[in-house]
UniProtKB/Swiss-Prot annotation:
Keyword annotations of the record: Metal-binding, Zinc, Zinc-finger
Name by which UniProt lists this protein: Uncharacterized RING finger protein T02C1.1
InterPro entries: Znf_C3HC4_RING-type (IPR018957), Znf_RING (IPR001841), Znf_RING/FYVE/PHD (IPR013083), Znf_RING_CS (IPR017907)
Keyword Zinc included in the entry's annotation: yes
Superkingdom in the source lineage: Eukaryota
Disulfide bonds: none
Zinc-finger among keywords: yes
Organism in which the protein naturally occurs: Caenorhabditis elegans
Zinc finger (RING-type): 8-46
């Protein structure tokens, strides 16, 4: 067995919570979910795909392989880091979409989304996710580098 057999094609590191998608390719959960937030195609073959499914067999094999190579400490640290990133990403997306769905057809300023958020990491992630979602599910007016940019659900401007 080789390292490449247990590596994600997105992050090029050992799988963390590997998931398989419809075309048969496997990725780290964080990597594929982050990718699918902005593009619904497989990063390798570009086939359309649905929700990733956790691949517990590959996860077990990866953990065994990592343990046999005596690099499990670094692997588990990376796993904890990915889980934290995924939680942060999910929290940011919930804040964005909840706010925009409260008043369908209306827009909101990015500063309103982050105004009551105390956690600087979460604020940063909200701003990052807004930039990632523009063109996919969001439209904007103003400079995306500024907090006073106005965002709305894509194609909702005709409803105002």
């Amino acid at each position: 067995m080789r390292d490449e057999d247990f590596c994600c094609a997105v992050c090029l590191d050992f799988f963390v919570e590997p998931c398989i998608i419809e075309c048969g390719h496997s990725y780290c959960r964080f990597c594929i979910e982050s990718h699918l937030n902005i593009n619904e195609k497989c990063p390798l073959c570009r086939a359309h795909t649905g929700n990733p499914i956790r691949n517990r067999q590959l996860e077990s094999l990866t953990m065994s392989y990592v343990s046999s190579r005596n690099i499990s400490t670094e692997y588990y640290e990376r796993m904890k880091s990915y889980q934290k990133k995924l939680l942060l990403q999910n929290r940011a997306l919930v804040i964005i979409w909840t706010e925009l769905n409260k008043r369908p057809g209306h827009s909101t300023e990015l500063c309103n989304l982050v105004r009551n958020v105390q956690d600087e990491e979460l604020k940063s992630e909200i701003m990052w996710q807004v930039k990632q979602q523009v063109g996919v599910g969001l439209e904007h007016t103003g400079d995306l580098q500024e907090e006073n940019v106005t965002i709305r659900l894509k194609n909702s401007s005709s409803q105002q």
